[in-house]
Regions:
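Acidic-enriched and Gly/Ser
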Residues: 1-120, 138-140, 149-167
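A structural micro-motif recognizing beta-strand termini
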Residues: 127-129, 153
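Structured alpha-helical
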Residues: 134
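Generic structural signal for buried aliphatic residues
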Residues: 122-124
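Short, conserved beta-turn/loop elements at beta-strand boundaries and strand-helix junctions
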Residues: 129-131, 141-146
């Protein structure tokens, strides 16, 4: 995590995340993204991408809070609202720990890749992927959808991530 970077979280309409990112990324000094995750699609039997946190856009910038607020207020699409989440009036909704977890689990393209593991004593043991060494955080696993539920406190959201068991 770069100390001169500031992280912001925007709430918007589900399915409009990419539209918001596109507008924000046209501004100098702003990097906006909507994290994606790989998951196993049962019907197509392929790994596909979907939004990790529907309705959320993350913004990383070296600009000051005042400059970023000005860009947020100029958002041109009236049919799409954006609202910056803050703990208090001037404190971003992301803690340093949340930023660390997010950057640790995602790759450079802001995608949480599929993890792979084995079942040992009725517990998932991840052998490769971003969840490596995080077995204790897995509290539930759905074999049919190949999704693990993580016990991570992050914007009051439940993390459901892709984990495929290998023989």
């Amino acid at each position: 995590m770069n100390l001169d970077e500031h992280w912001y979280v925007l709430l918007t309409i589900r399915s409009k995340e990419e539209e918001v990112c596109k507008y924000l990324n046209e501004n100098e000094g702003i990097f906006a993204f909507s994290p994606k995750m790989e998951f196993y699609h049962r019907v197509s039997k392929q790994i596909q991408l979907r939004t990790l946190f529907g309705g959320y856009v993350f913004v990383v910038s070296k600009l000051s809070q005042v400059e970023v607020d000005r860009i947020f207020r100029k958002f041109p699409l009236e049919s799409v609202f954006i609202h910056e989440l803050k703990y208090k009036e001037d404190i971003s909704a992301l803690t340093d720990e949340e930023i660390r977890i997010l950057t640790m689990l995602m790759d450079d393209k802001k995608i949480l890749r599929m993890s792979y593991g084995v079942l040992l004593n009725n517990k998932i043991h991840v052998t490769r992927g971003p969840l490596l060494n995080m077995d204790d955080y897995i509290i539930k696993y759905g074999k049919h959808n190949r999704l693990a539920t993580l016990n991570l406190n992050f914007l009051n959201q439940i993390w459901k991530v892709g984990v495929t068991l290998v023989e």
